[in-house]
Amino acid sequence: MTDTNDRMTKLQTMHQRAPDDTFLIYAIAMEHKKLGQLSQAIEWLGRVVEKDPTYCAAYHQAALTHEESGDLEAAKKWYRDGIAAAGRKGDTHTMGEMQAALAAIE
């Protein structure tokens, strides 16, 4: 078993024990992204924001992952939603990063 598979197995096991832990869900998403499994990464990032609509990093990573897969329209939507979430949360730094990224693809 490779280190990456071992990490994914451990994350999945922890997730079974704590299914509402958004950090674990985010970690699983990022592991999928690292493996090049972009659609799975996006699915898991969607789960993060379903559980915590203020988890700004999930919006940003979902947008970046959509960009990587070539779906710029979906990326724009994730950026816009993330900018709104960051604004509600008062996270001006992340909001600025996503605004700049959105401007770069519009």
List each model region and its residues.
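Canonical positions in the second alpha-helix
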Residues: 13-14, 47-48, 82
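Structural marker of alpha-solenoid helical repeat scaffolds
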Residues: 17, 50-51, 68, 85-89
